[in-house]
From Swiss-Prot:
Biological source species: Xylella fastidiosa (strain Temecula1 / ATCC 700964)
Entries under HAMAP family matching the protein: MraY (MF_00038)
Top-level EC class as recorded in UniProt: transferase
Annotated compartments: Cell inner membrane
InterPro entries named among the record's database cross-references: Glycosyl_transferase_4, PNAcMuramoyl-5peptid_Trfase, PNAcMuramoyl-5peptid_Trfase_CS
EC number(s) stated in the UniProt entry for this protein: 2.7.8.13
Cofactor(s), names only, from the UniProt record: Mg(2+)
Family to which this protein belongs: Belongs to the glycosyltransferase 4 family. MraY subfamily.
Cellular component terms per the entry's GO annotation: plasma membrane
Membrane-protein topology: Multi-pass membrane protein
Protein name (Swiss-Prot/TrEMBL): Phospho-N-acetylmuramoyl-pentapeptide-transferase
Recorded GO MF terms: metal ion binding; phospho-N-acetylmuramoyl-pentapeptide-transferase activity; UDP-N-acetylmuramoyl-L-alanyl-D-glutamyl-meso-2,6-diaminopimelyl-D-alanyl-D-alanine:undecaprenyl-phosphate transferase activity
Superkingdom per UniProt: Bacteria
Pathway participation: Cell wall biogenesis; peptidoglycan biosynthesis
Length: 361
Protein backbone atom coordinates (compact mmCIF):
# COMPACT_ATOMS: atom_id res chain seq x y z
CA UNK A 1 0.00 0.00 0.00
CA UNK A 2 2.68 2.47 1.03
CA UNK A 3 4.81 1.21 -1.85
CA UNK A 4 2.09 2.10 -4.34
CA UNK A 5 1.60 5.49 -2.68
CA UNK A 6 5.35 6.15 -2.85
CA UNK A 7 5.34 5.25 -6.54
CA UNK A 8 2.65 7.88 -7.10
CA UNK A 9 4.57 10.49 -5.07
CA UNK A 10 7.68 9.85 -7.13
CA UNK A 11 6.30 12.06 -9.91
CA UNK A 12 6.47 15.00 -7.49
CA UNK A 13 9.64 14.16 -5.55
CA UNK A 14 12.46 11.98 -6.87
CA UNK A 15 13.45 10.98 -3.32
CA UNK A 16 10.52 8.55 -3.30
CA UNK A 17 12.35 6.61 -6.00
CA UNK A 18 14.10 4.87 -3.10
CA UNK A 19 11.00 2.73 -2.72
CA UNK A 20 11.68 1.13 -6.10
CA UNK A 21 14.67 -0.65 -4.55
CA UNK A 22 13.86 -4.06 -3.12
CA UNK A 23 16.73 -3.82 -0.64
CA UNK A 24 15.37 -0.57 0.82
CA UNK A 25 11.83 -1.92 1.10
CA UNK A 26 13.06 -5.18 2.61
CA UNK A 27 14.76 -3.23 5.41
CA UNK A 28 11.55 -1.30 6.00
CA UNK A 29 9.56 -4.55 5.98
CA UNK A 30 11.84 -6.12 8.58
CA UNK A 31 11.77 -3.07 10.85
CA UNK A 32 8.00 -2.69 10.50
CA UNK A 33 7.37 -6.32 11.44
CA UNK A 34 9.87 -6.11 14.31
CA UNK A 35 8.43 -2.98 15.91
CA UNK A 36 4.84 -4.11 15.37
CA UNK A 37 5.69 -7.37 17.16
CA UNK A 38 7.26 -5.56 20.10
CA UNK A 39 4.29 -3.20 20.29
CA UNK A 40 1.45 -5.68 19.89
CA UNK A 41 3.15 -8.59 21.68
CA UNK A 42 2.50 -7.64 25.32
CA UNK A 43 -1.18 -6.94 24.65
CA UNK A 44 -1.64 -10.18 22.72
CA UNK A 45 0.15 -12.26 25.34
CA UNK A 46 -2.06 -10.77 28.05
CA UNK A 47 -5.16 -11.71 26.06
CA UNK A 48 -3.87 -15.23 25.32
CA UNK A 49 -2.99 -15.82 28.97
CA UNK A 50 -6.65 -15.37 29.87
CA UNK A 51 -7.72 -18.10 27.46
CA UNK A 52 -8.37 -21.67 28.59
CA UNK A 53 -5.41 -22.00 30.95
CA UNK A 54 -2.56 -22.06 28.43
CA UNK A 55 -0.72 -24.79 26.56
CA UNK A 56 -1.50 -28.40 27.61
CA UNK A 57 1.71 -30.35 28.37
CA UNK A 58 2.29 -33.95 27.23
CA UNK A 59 2.22 -36.29 30.23
CA UNK A 60 4.84 -38.54 28.60
CA UNK A 61 7.20 -35.64 27.95
CA UNK A 62 10.23 -34.53 29.97
CA UNK A 63 9.25 -33.81 33.58
CA UNK A 64 10.97 -30.42 33.49
CA UNK A 65 8.30 -29.29 30.99
CA UNK A 66 5.51 -29.56 33.56
CA UNK A 67 6.59 -26.16 34.88
CA UNK A 68 5.59 -24.72 31.50
CA UNK A 69 1.93 -25.62 32.04
CA UNK A 70 -0.25 -22.55 31.74
CA UNK A 71 2.09 -20.67 29.40
CA UNK A 72 -0.11 -19.08 26.72
CA UNK A 73 0.10 -20.51 23.22
CA UNK A 74 -1.02 -19.33 19.76
CA UNK A 75 1.76 -16.72 19.87
CA UNK A 76 2.39 -17.47 16.21
CA UNK A 77 -0.63 -15.32 15.47
CA UNK A 78 1.60 -12.35 16.33
CA UNK A 79 4.03 -13.40 13.58
CA UNK A 80 1.30 -13.90 11.00
CA UNK A 81 -0.32 -10.55 11.76
CA UNK A 82 2.88 -8.54 11.62
CA UNK A 83 4.23 -10.30 8.52
CA UNK A 84 0.94 -9.78 6.68
CA UNK A 85 0.72 -6.10 7.62
CA UNK A 86 4.35 -5.46 6.73
CA UNK A 87 4.06 -7.18 3.34
CA UNK A 88 0.85 -5.34 2.52
CA UNK A 89 2.61 -2.07 3.32
CA UNK A 90 5.90 -2.64 1.51
CA UNK A 91 5.31 -5.45 -0.98
CA UNK A 92 4.41 -5.16 -4.64
CA UNK A 93 0.78 -6.27 -4.55
CA UNK A 94 0.80 -6.81 -8.31
CA UNK A 95 3.16 -9.76 -7.87
CA UNK A 96 1.47 -13.16 -7.95
CA UNK A 97 4.22 -14.81 -5.90
CA UNK A 98 3.67 -12.37 -3.06
CA UNK A 99 -0.02 -13.21 -2.95
CA UNK A 100 0.60 -16.96 -3.23
CA UNK A 101 2.99 -17.00 -0.28
CA UNK A 102 0.62 -14.88 1.82
CA UNK A 103 -2.30 -17.19 1.01
CA UNK A 104 -0.24 -20.30 1.84
CA UNK A 105 0.90 -18.73 5.11
CA UNK A 106 -2.61 -17.80 6.19
CA UNK A 107 -4.10 -21.12 5.03
CA UNK A 108 -1.62 -23.21 6.99
CA UNK A 109 -1.95 -20.75 9.85
CA UNK A 110 -5.70 -21.42 9.86
CA UNK A 111 -5.03 -25.17 10.10
CA UNK A 112 -2.66 -24.51 12.98
CA UNK A 113 -5.17 -22.23 14.68
CA UNK A 114 -7.83 -24.96 14.56
CA UNK A 115 -5.33 -27.47 15.93
CA UNK A 116 -4.38 -25.14 18.79
CA UNK A 117 -8.03 -24.38 19.49
CA UNK A 118 -8.82 -28.08 19.92
CA UNK A 119 -5.84 -28.51 22.24
CA UNK A 120 -7.04 -25.67 24.44
CA UNK A 121 -10.77 -26.36 24.32
CA UNK A 122 -10.41 -30.09 25.04
CA UNK A 123 -7.24 -29.82 27.16
CA UNK A 124 -5.72 -32.38 24.78
CA UNK A 125 -2.05 -31.87 23.78
CA UNK A 126 -2.59 -33.98 20.64
CA UNK A 127 -5.06 -31.55 19.07
CA UNK A 128 -6.52 -32.14 15.61
CA UNK A 129 -6.36 -35.75 14.43
CA UNK A 130 -3.40 -36.32 12.13
CA UNK A 131 -5.44 -37.56 9.19
CA UNK A 132 -7.53 -34.37 9.12
CA UNK A 133 -4.49 -32.17 9.54
CA UNK A 134 -2.66 -33.87 6.66
CA UNK A 135 -5.77 -33.76 4.50
CA UNK A 136 -6.11 -30.00 4.92
CA UNK A 137 -2.38 -29.48 4.41
CA UNK A 138 -2.50 -31.64 1.30
CA UNK A 139 -5.32 -29.63 -0.23
CA UNK A 140 -3.43 -26.36 0.09
CA UNK A 141 -0.07 -27.88 -0.81
CA UNK A 142 -1.43 -29.41 -4.02
CA UNK A 143 -3.29 -26.21 -4.87
CA UNK A 144 -0.06 -24.22 -4.53
CA UNK A 145 1.76 -26.68 -6.77
CA UNK A 146 -0.91 -26.51 -9.46
CA UNK A 147 -0.95 -22.72 -9.32
CA UNK A 148 2.82 -22.47 -9.70
CA UNK A 149 2.95 -24.96 -12.55
CA UNK A 150 0.17 -23.48 -14.64
CA UNK A 151 1.26 -19.86 -14.11
CA UNK A 152 4.94 -20.51 -14.86
CA UNK A 153 6.11 -18.10 -17.55
CA UNK A 154 9.66 -19.40 -18.04
CA UNK A 155 10.97 -22.99 -18.37
CA UNK A 156 13.31 -22.43 -15.41
CA UNK A 157 10.30 -22.09 -13.10
CA UNK A 158 9.41 -25.76 -13.64
CA UNK A 159 12.91 -27.24 -13.78
CA UNK A 160 14.71 -29.09 -10.99
CA UNK A 161 18.24 -27.92 -10.22
CA UNK A 162 20.98 -29.57 -8.19
CA UNK A 163 23.25 -27.31 -6.11
CA UNK A 164 26.93 -27.27 -7.10
CA UNK A 165 26.05 -29.03 -10.37
CA UNK A 166 24.49 -26.04 -12.05
CA UNK A 167 24.75 -27.50 -15.54
CA UNK A 168 22.27 -30.21 -14.55
CA UNK A 169 18.68 -29.13 -15.15
CA UNK A 170 15.84 -31.63 -15.06
CA UNK A 171 12.58 -30.46 -16.69
CA UNK A 172 9.59 -31.50 -14.61
CA UNK A 173 6.24 -32.78 -15.75
CA UNK A 174 3.10 -31.39 -14.17
CA UNK A 175 2.80 -34.43 -11.89
CA UNK A 176 6.42 -34.41 -10.74
CA UNK A 177 6.42 -30.64 -10.17
CA UNK A 178 3.21 -30.71 -8.13
CA UNK A 179 4.48 -33.71 -6.16
CA UNK A 180 7.76 -31.97 -5.28
CA UNK A 181 5.92 -28.78 -4.34
CA UNK A 182 3.52 -30.75 -2.17
CA UNK A 183 6.26 -32.61 -0.30
CA UNK A 184 8.33 -29.50 0.32
CA UNK A 185 5.44 -27.35 1.53
CA UNK A 186 3.74 -29.99 3.67
CA UNK A 187 7.03 -31.56 4.73
CA UNK A 188 8.62 -28.37 5.99
CA UNK A 189 5.37 -27.24 7.55
CA UNK A 190 5.38 -30.32 9.76
CA UNK A 191 9.16 -30.25 10.24
CA UNK A 192 9.09 -26.77 11.76
CA UNK A 193 6.15 -27.84 13.90
CA UNK A 194 8.11 -30.83 15.26
CA UNK A 195 11.07 -28.58 16.02
CA UNK A 196 8.95 -26.14 18.01
CA UNK A 197 9.28 -28.01 21.29
CA UNK A 198 11.64 -25.77 23.26
CA UNK A 199 11.67 -22.04 23.95
CA UNK A 200 12.98 -20.25 20.86
CA UNK A 201 14.24 -23.45 19.25
CA UNK A 202 12.23 -23.19 16.02
CA UNK A 203 12.01 -19.44 15.48
CA UNK A 204 15.73 -18.63 15.21
CA UNK A 205 16.47 -21.25 12.52
CA UNK A 206 13.34 -20.00 10.74
CA UNK A 207 14.68 -16.43 10.80
CA UNK A 208 18.09 -17.56 9.53
CA UNK A 209 16.65 -19.66 6.70
CA UNK A 210 14.22 -16.89 5.74
CA UNK A 211 17.11 -14.42 5.46
CA UNK A 212 19.07 -16.82 3.26
CA UNK A 213 16.05 -17.54 1.06
CA UNK A 214 15.65 -13.79 0.70
CA UNK A 215 19.15 -13.65 -0.79
CA UNK A 216 18.28 -16.44 -3.23
CA UNK A 217 14.99 -14.75 -4.13
CA UNK A 218 16.67 -11.41 -4.77
CA UNK A 219 19.35 -13.00 -6.94
CA UNK A 220 16.84 -15.16 -8.85
CA UNK A 221 14.70 -12.17 -9.68
CA UNK A 222 17.66 -10.15 -10.96
CA UNK A 223 18.86 -11.18 -14.43
CA UNK A 224 22.37 -9.82 -13.88
CA UNK A 225 22.94 -11.61 -10.56
CA UNK A 226 21.29 -14.87 -11.59
CA UNK A 227 23.35 -15.05 -14.79
CA UNK A 228 26.58 -14.39 -12.90
CA UNK A 229 25.78 -16.92 -10.17
CA UNK A 230 24.38 -19.42 -12.69
CA UNK A 231 21.12 -19.90 -10.83
CA UNK A 232 17.68 -19.96 -12.48
CA UNK A 233 16.21 -16.59 -13.40
CA UNK A 234 12.64 -16.40 -12.12
CA UNK A 235 10.94 -13.11 -13.08
CA UNK A 236 9.11 -11.63 -10.10
CA UNK A 237 10.83 -13.82 -7.51
CA UNK A 238 12.86 -10.88 -6.23
CA UNK A 239 9.83 -9.45 -4.44
CA UNK A 240 9.85 -12.44 -2.12
CA UNK A 241 12.73 -10.80 -0.28
CA UNK A 242 10.09 -8.50 1.24
CA UNK A 243 8.30 -11.50 2.76
CA UNK A 244 11.57 -13.04 3.92
CA UNK A 245 12.59 -9.78 5.57
CA UNK A 246 9.20 -9.43 7.24
CA UNK A 247 9.50 -12.97 8.62
CA UNK A 248 12.96 -12.16 9.95
CA UNK A 249 11.72 -9.00 11.66
CA UNK A 250 8.57 -10.62 13.04
CA UNK A 251 10.55 -13.67 14.14
CA UNK A 252 13.04 -11.59 16.11
CA UNK A 253 10.18 -9.65 17.65
CA UNK A 254 8.50 -12.90 18.65
CA UNK A 255 11.77 -14.27 20.04
CA UNK A 256 11.79 -11.31 22.45
CA UNK A 257 8.85 -13.00 24.19
CA UNK A 258 9.62 -16.64 23.29
CA UNK A 259 13.22 -16.73 24.55
CA UNK A 260 13.86 -19.00 27.54
CA UNK A 261 11.91 -18.93 29.79
CA UNK A 262 9.13 -18.32 27.28
CA UNK A 263 6.31 -15.90 28.00
CA UNK A 264 4.35 -17.38 25.08
CA UNK A 265 4.56 -20.40 22.78
CA UNK A 266 4.32 -20.19 19.01
CA UNK A 267 1.75 -22.94 18.68
CA UNK A 268 0.82 -24.75 15.49
CA UNK A 269 -0.65 -21.54 14.09
CA UNK A 270 2.87 -20.18 13.70
CA UNK A 271 4.94 -23.31 13.14
CA UNK A 272 2.78 -24.83 10.39
CA UNK A 273 2.50 -21.49 8.60
CA UNK A 274 6.19 -20.60 8.72
CA UNK A 275 7.31 -24.03 7.57
CA UNK A 276 4.90 -23.90 4.65
CA UNK A 277 6.20 -20.45 3.68
CA UNK A 278 9.82 -21.64 3.67
CA UNK A 279 8.87 -24.59 1.49
CA UNK A 280 6.87 -22.43 -0.91
CA UNK A 281 9.61 -19.84 -1.37
CA UNK A 282 12.24 -22.54 -1.92
CA UNK A 283 10.09 -24.07 -4.66
CA UNK A 284 9.50 -20.71 -6.34
CA UNK A 285 13.21 -19.87 -6.49
CA UNK A 286 14.05 -23.49 -7.43
CA UNK A 287 16.27 -24.11 -4.40
CA UNK A 288 14.52 -27.12 -2.90
CA UNK A 289 17.69 -29.07 -2.13
CA UNK A 290 19.40 -26.00 -0.71
CA UNK A 291 16.48 -25.64 1.70
CA UNK A 292 17.08 -29.21 2.88
CA UNK A 293 20.64 -28.17 3.76
CA UNK A 294 19.85 -24.78 5.30
CA UNK A 295 16.85 -26.18 7.15
CA UNK A 296 18.89 -29.14 8.33
CA UNK A 297 17.79 -28.69 11.93
CA UNK A 298 14.18 -29.18 10.85
CA UNK A 299 15.16 -32.18 8.73
CA UNK A 300 17.11 -33.79 11.58
CA UNK A 301 14.20 -33.32 13.98
CA UNK A 302 11.83 -34.95 11.50
CA UNK A 303 14.17 -37.84 10.71
CA UNK A 304 14.58 -38.52 14.43
CA UNK A 305 10.82 -39.02 14.73
CA UNK A 306 10.70 -41.25 11.64
CA UNK A 307 13.64 -43.35 12.88
CA UNK A 308 12.15 -43.63 16.37
CA UNK A 309 8.72 -44.73 15.16
CA UNK A 310 10.11 -47.14 12.53
CA UNK A 311 12.56 -48.73 14.96
CA UNK A 312 9.91 -49.23 17.63
CA UNK A 313 7.45 -50.77 15.18
CA UNK A 314 10.03 -53.15 13.66
CA UNK A 315 12.10 -54.10 16.71
CA UNK A 316 10.21 -52.85 19.73
CA UNK A 317 13.24 -50.76 20.68
CA UNK A 318 13.76 -47.00 20.67
CA UNK A 319 16.85 -45.41 19.15
CA UNK A 320 16.48 -42.19 21.13
CA UNK A 321 15.36 -41.65 24.70
CA UNK A 322 12.58 -39.52 23.23
CA UNK A 323 11.78 -37.96 19.87
CA UNK A 324 12.02 -35.34 18.43
CA UNK A 325 15.73 -35.42 19.13
CA UNK A 326 15.83 -32.21 21.19
CA UNK A 327 13.99 -34.12 23.93
CA UNK A 328 16.64 -36.86 23.73
CA UNK A 329 19.32 -34.36 24.72
CA UNK A 330 17.12 -32.97 27.49
CA UNK A 331 16.73 -36.45 28.97
CA UNK A 332 20.50 -36.90 28.77
CA UNK A 333 20.78 -34.02 31.21
CA UNK A 334 21.44 -31.07 28.90
CA UNK A 335 19.85 -27.86 30.21
CA UNK A 336 17.20 -26.51 27.85
CA UNK A 337 19.15 -23.32 26.98
CA UNK A 338 22.17 -25.43 25.99
CA UNK A 339 20.08 -27.55 23.61
CA UNK A 340 18.53 -24.44 22.09
CA UNK A 341 21.75 -22.51 21.52
CA UNK A 342 23.62 -25.51 20.13
CA UNK A 343 20.82 -26.13 17.64
CA UNK A 344 21.00 -22.45 16.70
CA UNK A 345 24.74 -22.80 16.09
CA UNK A 346 24.14 -25.81 13.86
CA UNK A 347 21.53 -23.80 11.97
CA UNK A 348 23.96 -20.90 11.41
CA UNK A 349 26.56 -23.29 9.98
CA UNK A 350 24.04 -25.01 7.68
CA UNK A 351 22.69 -21.70 6.39
CA UNK A 352 26.23 -20.57 5.58
CA UNK A 353 26.80 -23.84 3.71
CA UNK A 354 23.59 -23.25 1.77
CA UNK A 355 24.63 -19.72 0.87
CA UNK A 356 28.02 -21.02 -0.27
CA UNK A 357 26.27 -22.98 -3.03
CA UNK A 358 25.62 -19.66 -4.75
CA UNK A 359 29.29 -19.57 -5.75
CA UNK A 360 30.19 -23.26 -5.89
CA UNK A 361 29.88 -24.55 -9.43
Amino acid sequence: MLFEFARWLQQFESLFGLFNYLTFRSILAALTALFLSLWIGPVLIQKLSQFKGGQPIRQDGPKMHFSKAGTPTMGGSLILMTVTLSVLLWGDLRNRYVWLVLVVMLAFGAIGWYDDWIKLARRDPNGLKSRWKYLLQSIFGLAAGLFLYFTADVPAAVTFYIPMFKSIALPLTSISFVAITYFWIVGFSNAVNLTDGLDGLAIMPTVLVACALGVFAYASGNTLFSSYLKIPTIPGAGDLIIICAAIAGAGLGFLWFNAYPAMVFMGDIGALALGAVLGTIAVIVRQELVLVVMGGVFVIETLSVIIQVTSFKLTGKRVFRMAPIHHHFELKGWPEPRVIVRFWIISVVLVLVGLATLKVR
